[in-house]
């Protein structure tokens, strides 16, 4: 967060100001609009090694109605939403199919987010209706296996993403907002 938000984005937004002379010809320096490549690239690289690859492994080892897959998908959408908001178009729908993967437009990525969240919410709602037992409580450091909290988080994420597109695709945003706030669990 510090490197990618505060020391990169916040400097450009003038939340911070350098207290030194400008170095136009010198080394990389975010204060002088010569970005440290590592700071700028690390969120993108980490998203694929620490979010997408583990998600893909879970998908390959679970079935479509697995609560584990649903939870992993919610985490993936949360992580990748920040990446597409920061970088714009990203490799998403074809991830894992090769080295040179086409980039998806932000519209396509957001639409895919909504589909994936809807599917994950359906899986977790089905699980929650069959049992009140926590799911993988021992391994869930966020909600301790409380599936209804994951459903609420997924709907909150769905609402957040819908608000992000509300000025560019009002109809889709309205549909997703209604689905998020109309869910029986929250």
Which functions belong to the PLM regions below?
Residues 1-17:
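A short, exposed helix-loop element centered on a Lys and neighboring polar residues
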Residues 19-75, 79-186:
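Structured, solvent-exposed acidic/aromatic patches
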């Amino acid at each position: 967060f510090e490197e990618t938000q505060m020391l990169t984005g916040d400097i450009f937004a003038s939340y911070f100001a350098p207290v030194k002379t400008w170095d136009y010809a010198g080394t990389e320096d975010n204060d002088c609009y010569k970005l440290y490549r590592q700071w700028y690239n690390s969120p993108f690289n980490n998203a694929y090694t620490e979010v997408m690859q583990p998600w893909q492994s879970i998908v390959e080892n679970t079935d479509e109605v697995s609560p584990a897959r649903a939870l992993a998908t919610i985490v993936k959408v949360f992580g990748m939403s920040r990446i597409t908001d920061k970088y714009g178009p990203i490799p998403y729908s074809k991830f894992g199919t090769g080295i040179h993967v086409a980039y998806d437009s932000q519209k396509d990525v957001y639409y895919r987010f909504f589909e994936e969240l809807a599917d994950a919410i359906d899986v977790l709602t089905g699980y929650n209706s069959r049992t009140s037992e926590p799911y993988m409580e021992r391994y869930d450091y966020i909600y301790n296996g409380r599936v209804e909290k994951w459903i609420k988080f997924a709907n909150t994420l769905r609402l957040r993403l819908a608000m992000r597109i509300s000025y560019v695709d009002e109809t889709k945003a309205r549909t997703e907002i209604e689905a998020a706030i109309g869910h029986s669990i929250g």
